[in-house]
């Protein structure tokens, strides 16, 4: 089902609030656990999601020396998560060691490289980070680096997904945050696109958070997203 390609973030500070969201949105099959909740609740939230037979996107964005990144990825496989993130800028060696580290697991997660945070715009890339590339070119270079090392896919802005799909091929997973329905505000995401447009551009999964979870009626918001995607 197309709805199974929507990942909803549990971007709340406590385990109790996370459970409340799970209870409120039982039809959501794929949930993202990020830094805030994981630091607060620890592996307990992953165990709860597994008990409820939900798919898990563990979005901790590992970025450290190669040995540490590899060890963190190896530890994460023990929780049975489906998707796991690390920064492409950790470098070729860290990416390669991460791939090797999870290869011995019974059901290893798909590794996703963060190409560039969707909150970063072209001015920040050039003037703050001193990277002399346009956003699409930089995102492509990071995705290609990840693909060369055996990483399964990338997290990227929907603005870059069409180019990445064309260059990286159909087997490279593309997960897009920065997806906003036509009726939702962009918030702090700079490079956004509607769910239908992102899927048509080549995204495998969409991360849609605040338009659903902070809506006055989250259940209604979820249904509206599903209705939009029914067009695809």
Swiss-Prot record:
> What cellular component terms from Gene Ontology apply here?
cytosol
| Superkingdom as given in the UniProt entry | Bacteria
Q: Which residues are the active-site ones?
A: 61
Q: In which pathway does it act?
A: Pyrimidine metabolism; UMP biosynthesis via de novo pathway; UMP from orotate: step 2/2
Which keywords are on file for this protein?
Decarboxylase, Lyase, Pyrimidine biosynthesis
Q: How does it assemble?
A: Homodimer.
Q: HAMAP family of this UniProt entry?
A: OMPdecase_type1_B
PANTHER family in UniProt: OROTIDINE 5'-PHOSPHATE DECARBOXYLASE
Protein name, as recorded:
Orotidine 5'-phosphate decarboxylase
Q: Which organism is it from?
A: Gloeothece citriformis (strain PCC 7424)
């Amino acid at each position: 089902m197309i709805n199974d390609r929507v990942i909803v973030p549990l971007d709340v500070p406590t385990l109790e609030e996370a459970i409340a969201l799970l209870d409120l949105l039982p039809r959501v099959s794929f949930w993202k656990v990020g830094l805030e909740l994981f630091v607060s609740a620890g592996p307990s939230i992953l165990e709860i999601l597994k008990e409820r037979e939900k798919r898990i996107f563990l979005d901790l964005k590992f970025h450290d020396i190669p040995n540490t990144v590899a060890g963190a990825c190896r530890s994460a496989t023990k929780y049975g998560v489906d998707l796991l993130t690390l920064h492409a800028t950790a470098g070729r060696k860290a990416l390669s060691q991460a791939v090797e580290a999870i290869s011995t697991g019974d059901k290893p997660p798909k590794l996703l490289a963060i190409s560039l945070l969707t909150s970063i715009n072209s001015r920040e890339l050039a003037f703050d980070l001193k990277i002399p590339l346009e956003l699409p070119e930089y995102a492509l270079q990071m995705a290609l680096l990840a693909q060369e090392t055996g990483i399964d896919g990338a997290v990227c802005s929907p603005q870059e997904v069409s180019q990445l799909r064309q260059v990286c091929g159909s087997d490279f997973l593309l997960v897009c945050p920065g997806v906003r329905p036509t009726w939702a505000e962009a918030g702090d995401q700079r490079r956004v696109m509607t769910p239908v447009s992102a899927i048509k551009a080549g995204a495998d999964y969409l991360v849609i958070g605040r338009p659903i979870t902070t809506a006055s009626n989250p259940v209604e918001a979820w249904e509206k997203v599903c209705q939009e995607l029914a067009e695809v």
